[in-house]
Amino acid sequence: MLFARLAGAMNHLFFLLTLAAYLGSFAGYVGYLVAGREWSGRLGSLLLALGLAAHYFALLERARGLHTVPYHDLAGSMSLFGWLLALTYLSLELFHRQRSVGAFVLPFVLAFFLFAQLSPPDRLAAPPAAGVTFAFHVTLSILAYAAFGLSCVLSLIYLGEQRLLHQHRVGDVVWRLPSLDLLDRMSQSSVLVGLISIAIGTVLGFVWVDRLTGNVWRYDPKYVITLLVLVAYVFYLRLARNPGWRGARASQLCVFNFAIVIFSFTVVNLFFSRSHRYF
């Protein structure tokens, strides 16, 4: 009883710390984008890093409380997605030295985190899955979804900024956004992370299935949609480097590709796949 109360208190503490850090980070990024305060942007990045740390421990406490992986249900999967989305964005921010899009990314991170925390627990039994191989398979798969989601956000920013520039509606906020070329490169970087993650994650998934059933070719509709996602994003990277497709067309294709990812993560997982309900 005492342990259960302590675990509940820790979960509540990490929830509050994560929420406060993410909200503060969002405010910092907005201050940087709207007012151009450099210290505000740095504070946003710092609070995002602190939020990632608190969110990680929240996932860890959730796993301990459930005595299983933290993503065996929809809430856990969404929470992990939000954490990996924030992690991917912060990595991209540091790599490209550009933090002005943080104000657009943090609302999605907050939405996934809050959805996971406020949704009712899933009463479905956890799948008979365990082991390091399975854990890496799921984590890398959700990392790929998060990276593809980030590329979609960046592509939407690209399309919005391009439209404002063409309409000559240029204000201080637009000037603080990354250049169109940098947004394009950031989107491609995010897609590359997603492709590497989903490729390795898929291979690990086949290895795990072979160990579990002895039949690596056991059919699952998820295999087909995953192959389609891989082909779609490889096609995007190819066209994004073509002068005739670079820019707006490539960004539109990136948004369309993420619609396939959403279809895979929702419709295919929930209604067609036997072993990929939440990842």
Task: Tell me what each language-model feature is.
Residues M1-G8:
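N-terminal amphipathic/basic-hydrophobic helices that include classical n-h-c signal peptides
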Residues A129-A130, V173, T213-N215:
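Glycine-rich, flexible loop/turn motifs
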